Amino acid sequence: MSIHIAAQQGEIADKILLPGDPLRAKFIAENFLDDAVCFNEVRNMFGYTGTYKGHCVSVMGTGMGMPSISIYARELIVDYGVKKLIRVGTAGSLNEEVHVRELVLAQAAATNSNIVRNDWPQYDFPQIASFDLLDKAYHIAKELGMTTHVGNVLSSDVFYSNYFEKNIELGKWGVKAVEMEAAALYYLAAQYHVDALAIMTISDSLVNPDEDTTAEERQNTFTDMMKVGLETLIAE
């Protein structure tokens, strides 16, 4: 057991999907995994291990924001030996070419957080995805016929930002979307020498306000990213 995860050693696979919403973790376990067993209910942050196409895979919620995902990802890596971590979550489009329900693979993550500067005050350390996972996910998504964008995202510490126009401006610099977790996940992956990737479904748009989705849709219908994430985890 770790501080926030109740699993025993051996109950968590070395490859895992990380949705922010614990109910999305439950949905993935019930709809994609065979023989799924719940290994964590602490703080209702559900985690499950099962098989996908014969491969042992886990899925666990992380909550919202970089502090929350940092807790769970670090414990999964350090205490349970997880080697491949793929975030599957939602994001808001910052780019007029990126639309609701399309996928974004975060090649890198800019951030307004001090999560890196706390360790490296003299550097702007780049938070980047594992190229191996990114390459596999891109080709899998293309083979499945999914509209997929690859590029930078903004990982924000603030959901209700007072710098809305500044965020929009980033879209003009090629930033695809804004979310709240990828930079922290990538930083931990670099620190502990594991592979990480963030796959997001666009749930709303900051540049096209008429494009949005319901809370139920966000929880239960964004299955493309789940398929891509699982296929990427088991790809050789």
From Swiss-Prot:
**SUPFAM superfamilies per UniProt:** Purine and uridine phosphorylases (SSF53167)
Q: List its EC numbers.
A: 2.4.2.1
Where do the annotations place phosphate binding? G20, R24, R43, R87, V88, G89, T90
GO BP annotations, alphabetical order = purine nucleoside catabolic process
Q: Where is this site: Important for catalytic activity?
A: R218
| Function in brief | Catalyzes the reversible phosphorolytic breakdown of the N-glycosidic bond in the beta-(deoxy)ribonucleoside molecules, with the formation of the corresponding free purine bases and pentose-1-phosphate.
Name of this chain's protein = Purine nucleoside phosphorylase DeoD-type
List the taxonomic lineage. Answer: Bacteria, Bacillati, Bacillota, Bacilli, Lactobacillales
Identify the gene encoding this protein.
deoD
